[in-house]
Amino acid sequence: ELIVVDNNSSDLEHRKYLNDLRNKGIVKLYQNNLNQFTFGLNECLKDLGDSRSLIAICDSDFLYPEPLDGECWLSVLVREMQKSPYIGKLGLSISLENIKNKKHLKSLYKREKEFSRLSLNNNVWAAQVDTTPALYRKDLFFWGKFRLYPGHMTANKPYYHIGRHKKIIGYHMGWDNDEYISKGPIVSVSKIDSFALYGGGFDRAVV
């Protein structure tokens, strides 16, 4: 089942496109009145219930790689999760080509490079998974139900590891745009409110 959650997009063409996909039965669409970041997914996750053992969550500004040996990225992640029960969340690696020469993203580049130092196994780096598409186990979080809140990356059960697949490398288009850096009101007030409510932190490069 393919589900799209729209967090109060302002682009009318985008909204029309999503409605067209819904009307054709291609996707199930949730449209929120506020951009509350991860909170926006929770109504959808509640409706999914507990029937799924694995849930894939994907950002909309991400380019996916070509199939690896005939397998799409999602099939590769599912297979890796099935054979590695100690991995609770598995994402794609991210190309750094669009930030390596940006001085104002030097700290971000350095941090991302650190995520390719330690291995969980031959296929997976031990790495934080944030802005990349990822596959989650439904019992990943200590609060029981599978729900997402600001700061959820620190709420993993201690016996689960988090990683990025070494061979599946995507491209984060959000880093192409220099407005990713703080040059104006790029983060909506409602999104900031959702972080403040749960004590979530922002990267200094973003706000």
What are these regions (language model features)?
Residues 111-207:
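C-terminal catalytic/acceptor-binding lobe
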Residues 10-15, 36-39, 46, 63, ...:
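A generic signature of intrinsically disordered, low-complexity regions enriched in glycine/proline
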Residues 11-13, 52, 72:
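Poly-acidic low-complexity segments
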Residues 37-41, 45-48, 63-148:
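Conserved catalytic core of nucleotide-sugar-dependent glycosyltransferases
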Residues 7, 58-61, 66-67:
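Active-site acidic Asp-centered loop
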Residues 22-24, 50, 84:
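Short, well-ordered coil/turn elements that cap or connect secondary structure elements
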Residues 1-34:
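Acidic donor-binding segment of Leloir-type glycosyltransferases
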Residues 55:
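Short aromatic/hydrophobic "clamp" motif used to bind/position activated sugar donors
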